[in-house]
């Protein structure tokens, strides 16, 4: 825990103003995948053009995967940006379907940095991962449609900590 705290303090001091985190649902509901992906990519592009360098995502199925893929696409145009995977545990994908594991591993291979909150899963490791990402960021890009969810808890924490929050599910003109 001591090393984790030291790293956390270091990231807050050194990179917070250049860092964006992502939080979102695993299920997109009525939203079209390509629509969410394109909007996320557009927001990342705007952030990259305005000095955001580090983009942290939790690597889960759903919006985390969309965000990671969007960062990788934007990185082709803005090579200075970095994809940071902040994963709750090393065995996160243990019970996933094969196609999800394959996509997850491809993203891990292309990430600039991978940080694990814990070696193995325990109650609370996802919550700890979410708080770590918020604590190290100045902006939170989210996909929030269910206000009684873990994503809502993370976004509320981001607001409490003073982060700018951009919800991909909001009207695009209102966001930018």
Where are these predicted regions, by residue range?
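Single conserved hydrophobic/aromatic residue that forms the stacking wall/gate
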Residues: 1-12
